[in-house]
Amino acid sequence: METISTAAYDRGWQSQWDDMKKYGPFSRHLRRIIQQIIRPLEFQSVLDVGCGQGSLMQELQAEFPRITPYGIDLSASAVELARERVSGGCFRVMDITKGSLDEKYDLVVCSEVLEHLPDDMTALQNLRKMTGKYLLISAPQGRMREFERQYGHVRNYAAGELTDKIERSGFAVESVVEWGFPFYSPLYRDFLEVTGSKGTTGEFGAVRKLISNAIYYLFLLNSSRRGDEIFVLAQPVASS
């Protein structure tokens, strides 16, 4: 079981992942599906756990201009970028496995984080402390590829595992979306397993942006009922 060091994670945000998060087809679909799931909900304060450089919060602000944005991330470099890019936001460096903020937020989003954490149950318990109304989690499930291990994945969830852990952490699951079959997973993930993932990182020039955009539109043909990317919307259960 490999984990990525804090220093390596910070270096990734300094030089490797910014354009991938902005222009990469998978990251764009993550944001699209998150927005689709939360659109019917009522919320004002939003906490993005694992906020990175703020790309999700930028899009949420554009669609929901009245929200109050907050974010935490392990990387000081990512947090600095988020502070520069998200107007009116409050962003802090924090390890979700070691603590929580004192406040509660209407909506807590934790996207593509738990698969990196050896102690995901402690992270979920800390998320519970900060969730006022809704928690939305996205994570991979199914077979783990080698390039995902290189990105610091310590697990991909088995069927039913993530929802079970969420419920054991004091939440009631409201809805589940499974997405990605067949073009994202298995086809795109298997392609990256064979070719390596270097082409997805670093600066995106005009050609890479064009290719990424084409793949984004191909991914629109993926099933929203079947796939290895899972989105779970949950609400905290009142303490008895």
PLM segments and residue spans:
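Conserved N-terminal segment of class I S-adenosyl-L-methionine
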Residues: M1-L107, S111, M121-L124, N156-G160, ...
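A generic structural signal for alpha->beta connector loops
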Residues: R66, G88, G132, G170-V173
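Residues lining the SAM
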Residues: S111-L114, S138
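Di-metal (Zn2+ and/or Mg2+/Mn2+) metal-binding site signature of metallo-dependent hydrolases
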Residues: H116, D120
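A short glycine-rich, Lys/Arg-flanked "PGG" loop and its adjoining helix->strand segment in the class I
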Residues: M121-L135
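Short, glycine-/aromatic-enriched active-site segment of Class I SAM-dependent methyltransferases
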Residues: L135-R155, A159-E161
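Short aromatic-enriched loop/helix-cap "lid" or pocket-rim segments at secondary-structure transitions
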Residues: F147-Q150, S185-F191
